[in-house]
Every structure is written in structure tokens, then in C-alpha cells.
């Protein structure tokens, strides 16, 4: 993603220091300030996936869950996405947040620790307090319901669904 400097400046973009996963912020925060978008079929950057220490490796992501949660919380606070006038932009931004909430929730559950389950709960409570309409939209959606199935059985069902999705789409 390439943005003109003026777009980044207008958006007030400030990335947290010494934090992984800020590429999500870089793509998300300036987007409402973009007036025109162009697709160029050019590889500006090649990302080799497969190293064990890579930041997108599932085990590494679980180890850095606090950074994932921080980035997600920051993104939740940038805009009241339910009030974005452009319907397509609003839809995209809501979906992006839904994906971020899902990733954070799945990682917390996959970690298997009570501490991270509590952090997941706190993230959803943060969203509820920050933006109730968005919370209701995400929480009652398919992914939100799946991420919050009750009990150990619900968490096992979510992980089974995650593994099936993982095989189908080939991520991590």
C-alpha cells in the first residue's frame, strides 16, 4: 500500500514504536482520507513466508498477543466506522475490524491460557464500551458468535473451525 505523504499527514498516522502488526494500522487509518485509488500490478515488496521466527507464524503471534491486542484496540478507537458516509468504505472498515477481532480472539483461545482468555474478554468489553453499535454488529455476526461460543466445548469448536478454514485458505 502506497499513500502520498499528504494523505498520511491528514490522517494523523502515528505508529506505536517497537510494535509488530502495525502494518494493519498503516493500511487502515489513512483509508478514509483517500480520494482516489489505483491498482498497479507491480511487486513493490516480496514477503517470503515460511521462517519459524516470522511475525506471522502462529506460535510467534501467540507469543506477541499483547501487541496484536494493542494494535486492534488502537484501530477500534480511530473512527466510529458506523458513521462513515461512504457505504463501501464503511463496509470495508467494519470487515477489517471484524477480522482483527477474530484474529485476536482465536490467538487468545489457541494460547490455552486463562490469562489470554481474560484478555480476549477484555477486548470485547473494550469494544462494547467504545462503540456499542459496532460491538453489536460484530458480536452478533457469524465470526463474533463463533469467537464467543460458551465454555471449553465452544472454544474447541472454534479451533476446529479455524483449522478447517486454515486448510481451505492455506494461511499460517
Language-model regions, residue ranges each:
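Amphipathic alpha-helical repeat scaffolds of TPR domains
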Residues: 92-107
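Membrane-interface aromatic/basic loop that binds lipid-linked glycans or pyrophosphate carriers
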Residues: 110-172
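Conserved nucleotide-sugar donor-binding catalytic segment
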Residues: 4-61
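Catalytic core of nucleotide-sugar-dependent glycosyltransferases
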Residues: 42-51, 57-84, 103, 107-133
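Short, charged, amphipathic alpha-helical segments
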Residues: 89-95, 117-121
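Short, surface-exposed acidic
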Residues: 86-90, 135-137
Amino acid at each position: 500500500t502506497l499513500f502520498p505523504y499528504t494523505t498520511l499527514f491528514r490522517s494523523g498516522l502515528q505508529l506505536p514504536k517497537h510494535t509488530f502488526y502495525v502494518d494493519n494500522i498503516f493500511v487502515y487509518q489513512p483509508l478514509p482520507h483517500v480520494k482516489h485509488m489505483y491498482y498497479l500490478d507491480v511487486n513493490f515488496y516480496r514477503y517470503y513466508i515460511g521462517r519459524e521466527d516470522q511475525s506471522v507464524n502462529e506460535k510467534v503471534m501467540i507469543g506477541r498477543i499483547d501487541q496484536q491486542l494493542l494494535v486492534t484496540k488502537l484501530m477500534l478507537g480511530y473512527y466510529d466506522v458506523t458513521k462513515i458516509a461512504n457505504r463501501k468504505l464503511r463496509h470495508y472498515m467494519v470487515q477489517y475490524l471484524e477480522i482483527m477481532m477474530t484474529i485476536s480472539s482465536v490467538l487468545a483461545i489457541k494460547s490455552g491460557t486463562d490469562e489470554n482468555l481474560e484478555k480476549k474478554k477484555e477486548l470485547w468489553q473494550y469494544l462494547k464500551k467504545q462503540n456499542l453499535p459496532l460491538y453489536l454488529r460484530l458480536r452478533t455476526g457469524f465470526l463474533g458468535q463463533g469467537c464467543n461460543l460458551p465454555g471449553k466445548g465452544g472454544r474447541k469448536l472454534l479451533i476446529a473451525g479455524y483449522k478447517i478454514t486454515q486448510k481451505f485458505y492455506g494461511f499460517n
